[in-house]
Amino acid sequence: MVTSTGPEAELAPIEQAKKRAAFACGEKYVQSGCRLGVGSGSTVKYLVEYLKQGFQNGSLKDIICVPTSFLTKQWLIESGLPVSDLDSHPELDVCIDGADEVDGQFTCIKGGGGCLAQEKIVQTAAKNFYVIADYLKDSKHLGDRYPNVPIEVLPLAAQPLLRSIPRAEGGSCQLRQAVKKCGPIVTDNGNFIIDWQFEKNVSGRDWFAIQQRLANTPGIVETGLFIGCVDAVFFAYSDGSVKEIVNSKKH
């Protein structure tokens, strides 16, 4: 048994929510012997904290953690957790990750941290996929909370895609720039990120069709659209509550 103890009161309210969501999901879906895909981002660091507590106190035994990014791998190693990869464990029991936005149809935008391709690869290797998020990620329609769809692209294709994506899909595109280095963000895979700012208030938008068109475009490695893959979302709210919303279409 792992409980969300410690100096939670010292955390900002939004961080408290992230921690509660991570601990609630871990408590329900991570068991001893689990082969677990571990996502990336600020909410996932609390999942790593949960795993560390369980592993150290013996309530979680023989778990295997497959990270979705270099940073997550470092968190796992620093926490003393067993780390593996898809070469050794190509089939996972569970993947748990955060999201930048989740709409009422369980469609997610991910990739704010630039890890979207590896996140999607690990997610597809898992039998079940659970999202952990604070209340600011809960939306009725994509774009209400997060304005862009991140798209990982080959560097060679970046400039043509900055022009062709808006022509085909509307909106506008920007090449994501780094903060502490000159030039664009470079992903763990050595690629660039284009942020597609899609047009809002478009009724009947078919995200699946958009995903298919983008995925079939030469030079695009992967998009931050996660469609039809979420089994449940754990949203933590400012009043201290955590709500699990189960995707009935997958159960």
From Swiss-Prot:
EC number of this enzyme: 5.3.1.6
GO MF annotation: an example: ribose-5-phosphate isomerase activity
Catalytic activity: aldehydo-D-ribose 5-phosphate = D-ribulose 5-phosphate
Similarity-based family: Belongs to the ribose 5-phosphate isomerase family.
Keyword Isomerase set for record: yes
Pathway named in the protein's UniProt entry: Carbohydrate degradation; pentose phosphate pathway; D-ribose 5-phosphate from D-ribulose 5-phosphate (non-oxidative stage): step 1/1
SUPFAM superfamilies per record: D-ribose-5-phosphate isomerase (RpiA), lid domain, NagB/RpiA/CoA transferase-like
Keyword Isomerase in record: yes
Top EC class for this record: isomerase
Underlying gene: rpia-1
Matches recorded under NCBIfam families: PRK00702.1, rpiA
Name the UniProt record assigns to this protein: Probable-ribose 5-phosphate isomerase
Keywords assigned by UniProt, alphabetized: Isomerase
Record GO biological process: D-ribose metabolic process; pentose-phosphate shunt, non-oxidative branch
Organismal lineage: Eukaryota, Metazoa, Ecdysozoa, Nematoda, Chromadorea
One GO term describing the cellular component: cytoplasm
